[in-house]
Amino acid sequence: TSGCWSLWKNIAKQDPAFGHPEKFCSDITKTNWESATVTTLDDKILPYIEKICQRDPRSGKTVTGGIVSCKDSSWLLSWTINRQGQFKEQDKDKVCVWVYGLFTDVPGDFIKKPMKECTGKEITEEWLYHLGVPEDQIEDLAEHSAVCVPTMMPYITAFFMPRTKGDRPDVIPDGCVNFAFLGQFTETPRDTVFTTEYSVRTAMEAVYG
C-alpha cells in the first residue's frame, strides 16, 4: 500500500478513535476498477458513437450527456464522452473517450480474458464490440483507428467497503486539539463519499471545528 495508507495505519495504532484503515485497504480484489482513455484517430469509429448518442461527438457540445453503461457486458463496461476538445492542445479531429470496467477479473465477451490482463488494444476491441461494430472489423479499428491507455485503480471503491461505526474516524476525534482527519475516509453526517464536496466539507469542518 502507499504512504498515505501507511501514515493512517501508524496514526490509528495510537488510539481506537483514529479508525481502522485495514477495513478499506486490505483486499484490492474487492476495491479495484480499471479505467482507460480511448482516443480516436480517424472517422471510422465515430458513426457507431453517433448512433448511440444521436449527437456529433466533434460538435463541441454535449456528447453522451452522462455515462453509457453496457448492461450485458461481463466487465460491466461503461463509457462517456465529455464535450470535445477535452484538452487544451487536443487535435480537433480526435475524440477522447473515458472507458471503465467494474469487474476486472472475469473474461470479456469478445476478448476472452480478464480486463486486468488486457492491453489497451484489447480493451478497445471489447468496447468496440459493445458499440456494435461488426466483429470482422473490430481488430482493424482497434489497431489503426484508436489508441488506448489503460489505468488500474486498485483502491477506487475502497470508500464503499463494508464497515461499522468507528472504522472511519470523526473529523475531529474527541479530545483532539490542532489535529483532524479529512477526506473520503472520515465520518461526517448527512453526506456521501466519492465526491469532491465530501473532501471539501471535511476540510471545512477540520478548520472551523
Residue ranges and their predicted role:
Residues 1-209:
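C-terminal segments that line or cap access tunnels to active or ligand-binding sites in enzymes
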